[in-house]
């Protein structure tokens, strides 16, 4: 139980910032788009925009960042020490029917958050990012 409290206390200062980032990140329609796919945007412009959002966030926070052709963004605390690799994706599946609100607008209902990508995989990606930010040396 003490470890849980330790990590909750470590994350608490970032909660408001993370929610703002999640809202902005979710708002990016990053469904694979064959029509906007080209050499600079291998998965379409929306996916590239989502990857660039993460890239810019990490650069702003002082991380070493490499964007490999809008396919992979690597975030490092340094380039010398061994690193832990966390893999996540910034694209989302196409929007289906039945959404009671805009699927790219973060909606809070009670203790739950709803939007395309909250659980797969934009929310977890940002959780890992803010964990890295909180724990970095």
Question: What is each PLM-predicted segment?
Answer:
Residues 117-132:
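Active-site alpha-helical elements of protease catalytic centers
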């Amino acid at each position: 139980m003490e470890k849980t409290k330790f990590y909750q206390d470590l994350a608490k200062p970032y909660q408001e910032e993370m929610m703002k980032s999640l809202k902005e990140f979710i708002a990016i329609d990053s469904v694979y788009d064959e029509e906007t796919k080209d050499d600079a945007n291998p998965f379409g412009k929306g996916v590239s925009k989502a990857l660039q959002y993460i890239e810019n966030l990490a650069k702003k926070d002082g991380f070493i960042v490499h964007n490999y052709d809008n396919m992979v963004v690597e975030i490092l605390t340094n380039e010398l020490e061994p690193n832990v690799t966390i893999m996540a994706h910034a694209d989302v599946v196409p929007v289906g029917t039945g959404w009671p609100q805009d699927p790219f607008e973060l909606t809070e209902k009670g203790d739950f958050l709803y939007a395309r990508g909250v659980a797969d995989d934009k929310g977890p990606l940002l959780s890992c990012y803010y964990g890295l930010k909180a724990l970095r040396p």
